[in-house]
UniProtKB/Swiss-Prot annotation:
Location in the cell: Mitochondrion inner membrane
Family: Belongs to the cytochrome b family.
Protein name per Swiss-Prot or TrEMBL: Cytochrome b
Residue sites binding heme b b566 per the record: H89, H188
Reported function: Component of the ubiquinol-cytochrome c reductase complex (complex III or cytochrome b-c1 complex) that is part of the mitochondrial respiratory chain. The b-c1 complex mediates electron transfer from ubiquinol to cytochrome c. Contributes to the generation of a proton gradient across the mitochondrial membrane that is then used for ATP synthesis.
Chief subcellular location: mitochondrion
Originating species: Bungarus fasciatus (Banded krait)
Protein residues bound to heme b b562: H75, H174
Highest taxon of source: Eukaryota
Length: 370
């Protein structure tokens, strides 16, 4: 039995002493997941998955159900917090080279894809105008698949258009996928603690480890408290800050807003989709915008794990973050000049990161060890 397992048995999870606040987002994500499951359960009790009643049932939850407005707002704002935490969590993994723990990184990528699917299904459920159009646009992308596209789309819709069967199955999927997220999270954590967490230096932590409790657990509690405080402040003062005004109208297939946009946390992928004037090409780019994370562990060329001592790669990393923000911003704008060209340029820069990064690693190796 290894030293790590002996310490685990005596309730002392060994963790590197120098891990920073960026390592707290895992526990914050777990808190978000628990919040979402609890509030989601209470919302599901009162929700009706029927196109004629769904919108009214959400209004009923907000107006008539005791504390229903709290449940609904925590669930809606909690989803945004969930994505803020997960994007920071992924950025931390990219910056400090944590993707070299391949099993953890790949299980995390699977988690991200499952989470995005769950959030998309959840966005459709209130059956507001933007919910309906987001569902129409995204599910319609299946038709881009050669030969099978139309059949798959009709199969997913449960008919020849988005209708009652579509809403029912989306509700069923939105209910069941969080349990898949719990399972994947467990696998993610088990795989992580198989080797132990890394640290900002990217070196082996074995020589300097301290127990998780009380040293790091109190730090976790502080960040969780700050996050929940932010959640309650937003819920109390600006509960509709992140909602689309179009979604306050019941879905009407005969009306189309000026431009369709999903929730803010999908805007970067939607912006990439929109920047390519071809249905199949756009769909492929949309999938690759997330799936490209799978390639990162296999294209690492630098002798140094962390970006902490790699100034050239740091510039590239912060370019990626800026690009992510710019794509998100352009996706909120109508499809017109100059937003089309900005989207296209930033999309190219976004994907370039994953090509230039291994080349820069190789160049830095030559500079450090000529």
């Amino acid at each position: 039995m290894s030293n790590q397992h002996i310490l685990l048995m005596s309730n002392l999870l060994p963790v590197g002493s120098n891990i920073s606040t960026w390592w707290n987002f895992g526990s914050m994500l777990l808190t978000c997941l628990l919040l979402q499951i609890m509030t989601g359960f209470f919302l599901a009790i009162h929700y009706t998955a029927n196109i004629n009643l769904a919108f009214s049932s959400v209004v009923h939850i907000l107006r008539d159900v005791p504390y229903g407005w709290i449940m609904q707002n925590i669930h809606a704002i909690g989803a945004s917090l969930f994505f803020i935490c997960i994007y920071i969590h992924i950025a931390r993994g990219l910056y400090y080279g944590l993707y070299l723990n391949k099993e953890v990184w790949l299980s995390g990528t699977a988690l991200l894809i499952t989470l995005m699917a769950t959030a998309f299904f959840g966005y459709v459920l209130p059956w507001g105008q933007m919910s309906f159009l987001a569902a129409t646009v995204i599910t319609n992308l299946l038709t881009a698949i050669p030969y099978l596209g139309n059949t798959l789309t009709i199969w997913l819709w449960g008919g020849f258009s988005i209708n009652d069967p579509t809403l029912t199955r989306f509700f069923a999927l939105h209910f069941i996928l969080p349990f898949a997220i719990i399972s994947l999270s467990s696998i993610h954590i088990i795989l992580l603690h198989n080797e132990g967490s890394n640290n900002p230096l990217g070196t082996n932590s074995d020589i300097d480890k301290i127990p998780l409790h009380p040293y790091h657990s109190y730090k976790d509690m502080l960040m969780i408290t700050i996050m929940i405080t932010m959640l309650f402040i937003t819920m109390s003062f600006t509960p509709n800050l992140l909602n689309d005004p179009e979604n306050f109208s019941k879905a009407n297939p005969l009306l189309t807003p000026q431009h369709i946009k999903p929730e803010w946390y999908f805007l970067f992928a939607y912006g990439i989709l929109r920047s390519i004037p071809n249905k199949l090409g756009g769909t492929m780019a949309l999938i690759m915008s997330v799936a490209i994370l799978i390639t990162v562990p296999f294209t690492h060329t630098s002798h140094t794990r962390s970006m902490l001592f790699r100034p050239l790669t740091q510039i590239l990393f912060w370019t990626l973050i800026s690009t992510f923000i710019i794509i998100t911003w352009t996706a909120t704008k109508p499809v017109e000049s100059p937003f089309i060209s900005i989207s296209q340029m930033t999309s190219i820069i976004y994907f370039s990161f994953f090509i230039i990064n291994p080349l820069l690693g190789w160049i830095e190796n030559k500079i450090m060890m000529p």
